[in-house]
Amino acid sequence: MKAARIVKLNEPLQVQELQTPTPKGTQILVKVQSVGVCHSDVHVWEGYYEGIGGQPLKTTDRGVKYPLTPGHEIAGIVEGLGEQVEGFSKNERVLIYPWIGEGLCPACRIGEENLCDKPRSLGIYTDGGYAQYVLVPSYKYLVKIGNDMDTDTGAPLACAGLTSYGAVKNANLKPDDNVVIVGTGGLGLMAIQLAKAITGAKIIAMDIDDQKLDVAKKNGADITINSKKEDPVKAIMELTDKLGADAVIDFVNASKTVETDMQFLRRRARLVLVGLFGGELKLSLVMMPTRAYKIIGSYTGTISDMIELISLARRGVIKPVVSNRFKLEQATEALTMLKDGKILGRGVINP
């Protein structure tokens, strides 16, 4: 099989010919139809996140090993089954839950494998979906999507959709709330769709790209703010009668965006941090108790969340915005375009 692999950090991925795995026991071999291109893939390709004081937080320090086949938003067709697999048949169309844990830690024991102490996530800690086939360790990580869901729009549900869903749930939005969505890429757009459909909150979308904000408006944002062209703090305070936002979901999560977020939080507001751009933040410790802020880290979601999300997608409540499609040989181009902010919504590779 062919796979696009990270052999050297920040260098073009190499399309290599590898032996196609043979599934055993509970394993399932999936023929990849679509794999989403995610900012996490970019970080794994570059080999670092931005840490404190501008120092890089290396992916190898987090347990990532190279060479690696990236890609964790994977939809495809069951190709082969181990002898212990139950409930699945060859040629069934599936979405893979990639946030796999070792199964024994406290998080895994309550179904939160995405927060495992020793993660084995596909495309990050083990080979993922930038390939013609991917080996999944157990059939329990597969969810059937039937023939009514397109794999290009289904694949991003495994991360972009799941992460957005988890963030919206963590924001605990009420119908009269004002929520600011910071960053209107693939995740932000799905968060807007979800918040619009299931919360009734007033949605303020914030970005520095007018084109992305136009797409956000079409996907349900009530108000858009270009923070490069106007003062976002002044704009949001005016929109909220000088009270501030009830919740902020930051899909960028860089030092500059979070510093700005802190200036327009209402008392008792929830600040949900999702993005992985990183950096550091100085906090007024007095303001934390006196204004009773809640700062919440939100990382992907559970397989139960993904099943709920697929149901919402089937009902037309949400639909990932897929704007770019690539061949496997164009994997480096896809990552570069995403890094440079040239993909509106989600890019998908079709191996």
Question: Predicted regions span which residues?
Answer:
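Glycine-rich cofactor phosphate-binding loops and adjacent beta1-alpha1 units
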Residues: 171-175, 208, 214-294, 343
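Short, well-ordered coil/turn residues at beta-beta hairpins
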Residues: 34, 97, 249-251, 351
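Glycine-rich beta-strand-centered segment in the early N-terminal region that forms part
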Residues: 21-35, 50-106, 146-148, 152
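NAD(P)H dinucleotide-binding glycine-rich loop of Rossmann-like/cofactor-binding domains
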Residues: 58-72, 100-182, 213
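Residues located in well-ordered beta-strands
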Residues: 2, 14, 31, 75-77, ...
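Mid-domain Rossmann-like dinucleotide-binding core that forms the NAD(H)/NADP(H) cofactor-binding site
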Residues: 93, 147-230, 234, 238, ...
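Local beta-strand N-terminus motif with an aromatic residue
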Residues: 91, 176, 221, 244-245, ...
